[in-house]
Curated annotation (Swiss-Prot):
Catalyzes the condensation of carbamoyl phosphate and aspartate to form carbamoyl aspartate and inorganic phosphate, the committed step in the de novo pyrimidine nucleotide biosynthesis pathway. It comes from Nitrobacter hamburgensis (strain DSM 10229 / NCIMB 13809 / X14). It comes from the Bacteria. It holds the Pfam family OTCace. Signal peptide: none annotated. The gene is pyrB. InterPro entries: Asp/Orn_carbamoyltranf_P-bd, Asp/Orn_carbamoylTrfase, Asp/Orn_carbamoylTrfase_sf, Asp_carbamoyltransf, Asp_carbamoyltransf_Asp/Orn-bd. Belongs to the aspartate/ornithine carbamoyltransferase superfamily. ATCase family. Pathway: Pyrimidine metabolism; UMP biosynthesis via de novo pathway; (S)-dihydroorotate from bicarbonate: step 2/3. GO terms for biological process: 'de novo' pyrimidine nucleobase biosynthetic process; 'de novo' UMP biosynthetic process; amino acid metabolic process. Its EC number is 2.1.3.2. This is Aspartate carbamoyltransferase catalytic subunit. GO terms for cellular component: cytosol. Transmembrane segments: none annotated.
Length: 317
């Protein structure tokens, strides 16, 4: 068992609240550190001691399987004492404000808090009220930085680079924090980004984020190296954004016919959870061009890298 990685990278930030604000050097450093953890996680002994004696609280106000489990595994493999707080047991359901919750948790002296919340900006509010480091595990439609990092790692490992690639992000861009974080990261790293969706699922002024816009799959996937599908986030929809699920799949669901519009060696990604038969069919999701399972594996490595990089900034680290 070793206590540290070969990489000496230290993230120049106390928190990870978003991709926005990270430099190219920050992103590259996190991806390089993640590579070390990919190899560690494939060994029999997956333990490190770099977070021994540290307390990590996973604070999830929205249901999560992949992200919460991934952060829990990441923390435990680094030797942290990990506590998962369920929203059903939180005092916020009894009327306590988020600020009160933050101050209560801060009194327990956690070193790292990992938070997911349905409100954009909630994680930043928490970060202003606590002494430890805060990681954004998704806040509303704002950002999901570790998802963008694991997506970038997956792409880089399979394509050898990010610079110059064309990444088509397809589906419910309007409600997607994953799309926003990926757009920021991919643009920073020199990739071309094209968003593909019906007009009702595109944020107004999305072009200002430096993306190309297409409103049908033939145009959208033309020349794409990576096809990243997004699910319909019906829990965030207050009205009718698509006529029907079947019609949406007909025009925007990824099947073999539509995938053929992309480059022959194009690879398929999805942040999960997938709605099979809505934005993607099973043949493509489980096919040879799919990286979806690999994304899950990369998630643990990336979150280990983020936890260690932030822990190196903690007092007495």
């Amino acid at each position: 068992m070793t206590s540290s990685t070969k990489s000496s990278f230290v993230l120049g930030h106390r928190h990870l609240l978003g991709i926005e604000g990270l430099s190219v050097a920050d992103i590259t450093g996190l991806l390089d550190l993640s590579e070390e953890y990919v190899e560690l996680n494939r060994q029999v002994d997956k333990k490190r001691t770099s977070l021994r004696g540290r307390t990590q609280i996973n604070l999830f106000f929205e249901a999560s399987t992949r992200t919460q489990s991934s952060f829990e595994i990441a923390g435990k493999r680094l030797g942290a004492d990990v506590m998962n707080m369920s929203v059903s047991s939180m005092s916020t359901r009894k009327g306590e404000t988020l600020v009160d919750t933050a101050m209560t948790l801060n009194a327990m002296h956690p070193d790292i808090l990992v938070m997911r919340h349905s409100a954009s900006g909630a994680v930043e509010l928490l970060a202003r009220k606590v002494d430890g480091s805060v990681i954004n595990a998704g806040d509303g439609a704002h950002e999901h930085p570790t998802q963008a990092l694991l997506d970038a790692l997956t792409i880089r490992r399979n394509k050898g680079r990010l610079d110059g690639l064309l990444v088509a992000i397809c589906g419910d861009v309007l409600h997607s924090r994953v799309a926003r974080s990926n757009i920021i990261l991919l643009n920073a790293m020199g990739a071309r980004v094209r968003v593909v969706a019906p007009s009702t699922l595109l944020p107004p002024g999305i072009e200002r984020m430096g993306v190309e816009v297409a409103r049908d799959m033939r145009e959208g996937l033309d020349g794409a190296d990576i096809v990243m599908m997004l699910r319909l986030q019906r829990e965030r929809m207050s009205g009718s954004f698509v006529p029907s699920v079947s019609e949406y799949f007909h025009y925007f669901g990824l099947d073999q016919k539509k995938l053929a519009y992309a480059k022959p060696d194009a690879l398929v990604m999805h942040p999960g959870p997938m709605n099979r038969g809505v934005e993607i069919d099973s043949i493509v999701a489980d096919g040879a061009q799919s990286l979806i399972r690999e994304q899950v594996e990369m998630g643990v490595a990336v979150r280990m890298a983020v936890l260690e990089a932030l822990a190196r900034n903690l007092p007495n680290a």
